[in-house]
């Protein structure tokens, strides 16, 4: 993800990205959000949902701070590893990971023209972005 978009997430959700400045020996978040810009909106919505949920819970009882351990792409899908997430947070993350399979990682388009690249590194791309990257593509 571009530094500009990544920094928007860091600024808006500092608690989720609290380990971003830790060394590699302590956290994989030192690599940042290792995904394409097309998933920014999905990540932003996920972060806001988690923040809202944690705020609601925190009013009822003190809970450990939820934080991201790693945000990356793996086998064409968003992968997020979370610490201190309850069942609801884990379900939110699972939903976002599933949705990423229908959103172009490069441009963010959603829907019918989004598929997987073929050959080499598998990515979720729309037909147009796959063509620009000279990648094979299948629905």
Regions found by a protein language model. Give the residues of each.
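Long, charged N-terminal interaction/targeting segments
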Residues: 1-90
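Short, flexible, mixed-charge glycine/proline-rich loop motifs
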Residues: 72, 90-102, 114-120
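Short functional micro-motifs and their immediate structural scaffolds
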Residues: 109-115, 131-134
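Cysteine-rich micro-motifs
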Residues: 120-132
């Amino acid at each position: 993800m571009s530094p500009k978009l990544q920094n928007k997430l860091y600024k808006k959700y500092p608690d989720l990205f609290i380990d971003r400045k830790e060394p590699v020996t302590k956290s994989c978040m030192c690599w940042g959000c290792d995904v394409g810009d097309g998933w920014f909106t999905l990540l932003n919505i996920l972060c806001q949902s988690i923040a809202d949920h944690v705020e609601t819970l925190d009013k009822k009882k003190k809970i450990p701070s939820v934080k991201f351990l790693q945000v990356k792409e793996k086998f064409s899908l968003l992968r997020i590893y979370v610490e201190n997430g309850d069942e609801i947070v884990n379900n939110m993350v699972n939903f976002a990971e599933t949705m990423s399979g229908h959103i172009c990682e490069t441009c963010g388009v959603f829907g019918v023209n989004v598929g997987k690249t073929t050959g080499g590194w598998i990515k979720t791309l729309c037909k147009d972005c796959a063509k620009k990257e000279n990648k094979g593509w299948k629905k």
